[in-house]
Amino acid sequence: MNSDEITAIMENKYSIDCVQLVLSPHLPGKGQKTHEGAGLISQTPNGSFLLKMYCSGNISPDDVLSRLDWKAGEIIHEEYYYHLTATDINGRQWEAKSIIPDIYLGLDTNRYIVHADIRELSYSSDLYDDVPAYSAAIYFPGDINVPFNTGVAVEKIVDGQNRSSSMKLNISKFSACDMKFELEKDVDWLTLNALSNTTIDDPLLMRMTESLQFVLARTLSWSIIELIHGKKRKVRVRSSQRNVVKSRVQPPIHFQQVDPSNKVWSLFGRYLSRTKGYTKELWHPIFRWIHAVIESGCSSLDTESLILSVATEGLLRDEFYNVHYGSAQLKTQIDDTRYIIAKLGLEKTFKDRVLGFLGNMLKPRAKDFLHILKDKNLVDSKLIEEYDKLRNSSAHGELADSSKFQIHLDRCAAALVLFYHIIFLAIGYSGPYTDYSTPGYPEKEFSCTGLP
């Protein structure tokens, strides 16, 4: 994909002129018709891709009216989905999945038009030269700020004469997980480039985008992914609106335009190292909570407080489930109590509830996990105290009192720092972070030494 095409996609002006389009049913043999014809795939002003194809042949009323069988609240059955193959005027073979066509009949009963929204398109092409390494380029639309560490020299040459020279700071270079990374900021997009001697597959691409979103505390959607290896190039293009800053949630490390020490990218590498072994094409369990917290910053402060509390508890349960809890004495006492209750002539339902309660005493609560970590000097007791106050009020639906707004803000900030500290422990990170629980937001050092 050339630079003009990339610019057109980022400006929502891209179109694919197709000499042949084929829409095939996802489940053959279900009576769904295959549609063929020429047409156009074009971007709408909001970044979506719209298919318009012109077909010939008879069409049944069932194909036109099939949507009338759908019921509100029910997931659309997969038999109604189609697979698209398209040949453009340059000979490239595009593919798209999970398409639901809309059919429009004309006055000529042997001709009809098909419209469809397309979420993602892809094509593969051959290269002349063999590229031994694996490379990936991910394009994110929008004005996305990152800390830079590399300048670019810009020269203005007129008639062979150098009229002026300047330096532009818009690139970051760093290494992580035996890969080389480079981020480049353009006017309307950010590009994340990765180079590796081992396979870069779809799950690893997800982990890379998660790492970037984590260190920036921003939800990001990509528009283009280009993968190159051997003599093959694969390009994926996706409907995506411009990424804009909506959340007030601050990143783990506050950054300026320049980051010569690469502290932000060190955290990027630590998260990637911890999560890259997760091979499902889903968000990593840690990132599910990170994403929830980032998105909570787009809502009210009360909503953010509640989600921060839930995310902290969920993260503790997911990542520290194997932490030793409960003394041998407690376990012995519970076993003795169970024995006594079992001998009593109690009604079965009541007895089962009491025994269940005793069993739960051996299952640590989120608060128990926090105190275990506190006893090992891994988290700050003051952060736990502020988190407890925030969690209790949020869980019981208590709205923030406007007269105590500063107190509520401070508790949210402390809860966010605690949330980040738990992530640091989960990924094994030691290094700088920004303490939003302290006025002035000083930078401090975190250590995961002593992690159980």
Which residues does each PLM region occupy?
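Long, contiguous, compositionally biased segments that the model treats as domain-scale units
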Residues: M1-V215, T219
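Internal, Lys/Arg-enriched amphipathic helical interaction segments that engage polyanionic partners
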Residues: T199-R274
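Amphipathic, oligomerization/interface secondary-structure segments
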Residues: V245-P452
